[in-house]
Amino acid sequence: MKSRKSLLISLAILATCTAIAVAGFRNQTQKDVGGDAAYQNSWPLTSYAVPKLTDPDKRARREARGKKYIKSTFRVHPDDPAENTTKVDALDPTLPSLPVMQSNTVVLGEVLAANAYLSNDQSGVYSEFNIRIEDVLKNADLEPLTNGCLIDVEREGGRVKFSSGHIHWYSVDKENMPLVGRRYIFFLTRGDQEEAFHILTAYELRGNKVFPLDELPQFKSQAGKNETDFVNALRTLLNTPS
């Protein structure tokens, strides 16, 4: 009986330790990821009733960027009583953990500012981030990029505040938003020079560790890696002939 009791105690301790270890790994790889109210509240916010820009150049620039998300399946509307809308099956599940071939541009940069904008027809919403580049790892875009320069990057989703005071959160399943003041390796695409760079995916660099921004299973393979080792491995991959 004594040995059975000892065995049960040992198994209980083992189960507790395993649960702690799994929870620790989950926190390491998914910290700051969607599903947390505080994190949702950090997403860029725009007003549904935002006035039109009066400067013709700024208005033309914003309309050129906003046309990408017209006729959005988000169907942003003030009469929608829901708290959130999530678009599913929009992220390519076959995307490699390091999508260097799929990216025009790969940079290390710090997020300086974030804003949300409605599409031209107000059916969609997207978030735009101003990035200060620390290091250009790849650039096949027509725009020359140098360390220290500023660029705008964007991705679909954001929060919209209606005149009633109601705030609706619009997201793409398994995609998250970078946070102001944080440093990331960004994998970017762009098809039109009038557009901001589009975030394919990104990895946050924090405390000399790597944290995937998005939630596809293959991205977790990079979670917790040493920052220097991660960047060096990425450079090697980028310099390897395809």
Stretch-by-stretch model annotation:
Residues 2-242:
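Transition segments tied to proteolytic processing and entry into folded domains
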